[in-house]
Each structure stands twice: as C-alpha cells, then as structure tokens.
Amino acid sequence: MKRAVVVFSGGQDSTTCLIQALQDYDDVHCITFDYGQRHRAEIEVAQELSQKLGAAAHKVLDVGLLNELATSSLTRDSIPVPDYDANAQGIPNTFVPGRNILFLTLASIYAYQVGAEAVITGVCETDFSGYPDCRDEFVKALNQAIVLGIARDIRFETPLMWLNKAETWALADYYQQLDTVRYHTLTCYNGIKGDGCGQCAACHLRANGLAQYQKDAATVMASLKQKVGLR
C-alpha cells in the first residue's frame, strides 16, 4: 500500500497537495501544527477539509514551543501583519524562523511511525513571499539529513515547487476541486476564510493567481500539464 503524509494547514497550497495526493496514494495522512499562530482558525479549517476530502487520518500536534522561540507577526499580536507591498524587499515579518524545519522533521517522524514513503509539502519557489525555508535547495538538504538521521528512505515531495499561483489554481481545477479550494480553505494571514482580507501578501498572491487563471484558463492549464506531465 502506498502511503503518504501531507503537511496540512488548510490553506490553498496544502489543500491542493492533499487533493492530488489522494489520487496518487492509497492511504493519505494529514498532519497539522498548532503553534499559537495568529491565523489559528486554519486548524479547524484543516480538520474540516481533511474529513471532507477523505484523508485516512489527521493528527494535530501542539508545537507551542515554536511560538515562544520564533518572533513573527504570525506569532505576536503586537506585530501587525503588513499589507501587500510590491516594492517590499528582504524577508517579511510574516516569516516564522524554523517553522518548516520543525514541521518537516516532525512530519518525517510521523511518516516513520505510520510507514509512509513520502512527506508532501506545498512550499513553492515561484510565486512566494520570500521565505528561505520554501526554497528547493532547503527542502532537498533537509530531506537528505532526515534520511541519514532516521535510516529510512522517506521522500519529500513538493508538487507545487515550480508552479505559479495561476497553475496551482489550474491543478485544483484539473481535479474538479477549484470551488473547494476557493471557498473552503484559509490562506489569509489575518485568519479570514475563502477570499480572505484582500490586503495581506498571502491574499494578494492567491487573488492574483486566480485572476490570471480565470483570464486565460486554457493557456494556464496547458502550461500546468506540460510542467507536471498531466494528460
């Protein structure tokens, strides 16, 4: 039996990964992390979606220690989430240092426990917010370290790594789940479900990608299929 673990936040990217994983694997487990995030409404959304979409199991882990150690606008109410700024440079204050290091490590331990061959994460280096732990070189380096550290060939999969946001919308549509992703996921840094607040960087990337896809769906879908080998 092919089994995978999806690092699942209930947002657009991880939900799209879950939708695809359910087609590719016989048994799919979700793992969600509660680190006291500002947008922790995502945890309830993730639980609802994992059940709705048909995941075999869903584990929610308390990793409150991350909140104590990592200073970010997503872990401190006293730090405001900035509005989207096309001219912003550097790493934004929404970056949570060590988050993906911790999440992927714990997901790998869980994969070891349940006998999964893959850990799937929705990180992306094409349309992203500049987080260093979303880069392909980081994911590959950590994957190598995990394999060495647990002596188990657990594979990290990043199906969205080289897709832009329009192509990510196309992928959800390919599996006939675009409305599920649009109306039932939570991507917004301010914790607003669906189309979100419309002001933060996460909402901007999501809305811009949807607009691009809706403007020329056929071209975007063709690009997606060519990139990932879909028919």
Curated annotation (Swiss-Prot):
SUPFAM superfamilies (alphabetical): Adenine nucleotide alpha hydrolases-like
GO biological process, one term: queuosine biosynthetic process
Top EC class for this record: ligase
Cofactor notes: Binds 1 zinc ion per subunit.
Enzyme Commission number(s) from the entry: 6.3.4.20
Top-level taxon of origin: Bacteria
Pathway: Purine metabolism; 7-cyano-7-deazaguanine biosynthesis
GO molecular function: ATP binding; ligase activity, forming carbon-nitrogen bonds; zinc ion binding
Family, similarity comment: Belongs to the QueC family.
Classification via PANTHER family: 7-CYANO-7-DEAZAGUANINE SYNTHASE (PTHR42914:SF1)
Protein name in the entry: 7-cyano-7-deazaguanine synthase
Protein species of origin: Pectobacterium atrosepticum (strain SCRI 1043 / ATCC BAA-672)
Gene name in the database record: queC
